C-alpha cells in the first residue's frame, strides 16, 4: 500500500480543479457529491475576478501555486493544454488526472509523462473521460471475453466537446458545435456548425477544420449558422459491440449502450480516477491499467462483498 493511500484513508483527498468550463463546472458538482473529497480550490484564467456565485465558498486563483495542500489536480482544460499543465503540476509533487482525447497521441503522451512522475513520486492518470476512458475499460473486458473477433465503437448522435473546442480555436470562428453521427461499424460522420466572426471566410475555415487531426480521418461537413447557442445540446451516447470467439466457440456477441450528459459523465470519471491516483505507485497510467475497484470510494473488502 502506498504512502499516499495510507494518508488518503486518514483524511479527505484535497482536489484542485484546473479550468472552469463545462467539465470544470460538473467536476465541482461531482466533488461536492463525493464524501471522501474536499475542494482545495479552482484555477481559472481570471482568478477571483468576476467569481461565479456558485464558487463563493471556494478559493479561486490564477495559478495552482496559490492553493494549499493539493493532493490531486483535475485538469478540466482543452486537450491540447493537458500536457503543459500536467508536466508543471506533477513536478510540484501533485498528482494529475485529465480527459485527453486525441486517441492517436495517448501512447506518446503517456511516455512523456512517465519519467516526470517517477522523478517526483507522483501519479498521472491520462485519457480518463468516458471515451477514451471508461469505454476503454469496457472494450478491454469485451476483448478478454472473446479474444478473437472484432469490436466497434459507435458514438452519438451527440455533441463532441473535444471536437467543438477544436473548431472554436480556428481563426474566424466565434462559436462552434461539432456533432458526431454514427454511420456504423465504428465509422462516423462529423457535422460541424460554425458561427463566424465578421469578415471570416467559410471556405478557409472549412479547410482548416478538415485538416486538423481531430477531423482528418472522418467524413466532415461544415455549415455556417447564425447562432450556435440555438443548436446546443450536451447529450451524447455510445454503442460498443464485440462479436468474436471464446476459446473455440464462435458467435459470442457483447453490447454496451449508454445515453449521457457528456460533461457530467466526464467529470464523474475524472473524480473517480483522482481517487484512484492516490492508490497507485508513481507513474503515468491509463484507465485500463488500474484495478477498477480503485475507482470506488470505500473499503476494499466491503466493496468485494457487495459487488462480487
What spans do the regions from the language model cover?
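N-terminal amphipathic/basic-hydrophobic helices that include classical n-h-c signal peptides
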Residues: 1-9
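C-terminal substrate-binding/catalytic lobe of Rossmann-fold NAD(P)-dependent oxidoreductases
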Residues: 14, 25-26, 33-64, 158-276, ...
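Glycine-rich Rossmann-fold phosphate-binding loop(s) that bind the pyrophosphate
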Residues: 20-21
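N-terminal Rossmann-fold NAD(P) dinucleotide-binding loop
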Residues: 24-25, 82
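Beta-loop-alpha module in the N-terminal Rossmann-like domain of NAD(P)-dependent dehydrogenases
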Residues: 69-91, 103-107
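Rossmann-fold NAD(P)-binding glycine/threonine-rich loop
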Residues: 100-124
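Rossmann-like NAD(P)H-binding beta-loop-alpha module
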Residues: 134-154, 162-166, 170
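C-terminal helix-rich "cap/oligomerization" subdomain common to oxidoreductases
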Residues: 277-308
Amino acid at each position: 500500500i502506498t504512502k499516499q493511500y495510507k494518508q488518503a484513508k486518514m483524511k479527505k483527498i484535497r482536489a484542485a480543479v484546473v479550468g472552469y468550463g463545462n467539465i470544470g463546472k460538473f467536476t465541482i458538482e461531482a466533488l461536492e457529491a463525493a464524501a471522501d473529497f474536499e475542494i482545495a480550490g479552482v484555477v481559472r484564467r481570471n482568478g477571483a475576478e468576476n467569481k461565479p456565485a456558485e464558487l463563493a465558498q471556494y478559493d479561486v486563483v490564477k495559478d495552482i501555486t496559490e492553493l494549499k495542500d493539493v493532493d490531486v489536480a483535475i485538469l478540466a482544460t482543452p486537450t491540447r493544454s493537458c500536457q503543459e499543465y500536467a508536466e508543471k503540476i506533477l513536478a510540484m509533487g501533485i498528482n494529475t488526472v485529465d480527459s485527453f482525447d486525441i486517441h492517436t497521441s495517448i501512447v506518446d503522451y503517456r511516455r512523456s509523462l512517465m519519467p516526470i512522475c517517477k522523478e517526483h513520486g507522483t501519479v498521472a492518470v491520462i485519457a480518463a473521460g468516458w471515451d477514451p476512458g471508461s469505454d476503454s475499460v469496457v472494450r478491454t473486458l469485451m476483448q478478454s471475453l472473446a479474444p478473437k473477433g472484432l469490436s466497434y465503437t459507435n458514438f452519438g448522435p451527440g455533441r463532441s466537446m473535444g471536437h467543438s473546442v477544436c473548431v472554436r480555436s480556428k481563426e474566424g470562428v466565434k462559436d462552434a458545435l461539432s456533432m458526431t453521427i454514427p454511420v456504423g461499424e465504428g465509422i462516423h460522420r462529423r457535422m460541424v456548425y460554425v458561427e463566424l466572426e465578421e469578415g471570416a471566410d467559410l471556405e478557409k475555415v472549412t479547410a482548416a477544420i478538415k485538416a486538423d487531426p481531430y477531423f482528418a480521418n472522418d467524413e466532415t461537413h461544415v455549415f455556417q449558422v447564425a447562432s450556435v447557442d440555438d443548436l446546443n445540446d450536451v447529450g451524447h451516447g455510445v454503442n460498443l459491440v464485440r462479436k468474436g470467439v471464446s476459446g473455440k466457440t464462435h458467435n459470442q456477441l457483447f453490447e454496451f449502450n449508454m445515453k449521457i450528459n457528456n460533461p457530467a459523465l466526464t467529470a464523474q470519471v475524472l473524480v473517480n480516477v483522482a481517487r484512484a491516483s492516490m492508490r497507485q505507485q508513481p507513474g503515468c497510467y491509463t484507465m485500463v491499467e488500474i484495478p477498477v475497484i480503485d475507482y470506488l470510494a470505500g473499503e476494499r473488502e466491503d466493496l468485494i462483498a457487495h459487488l462480487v
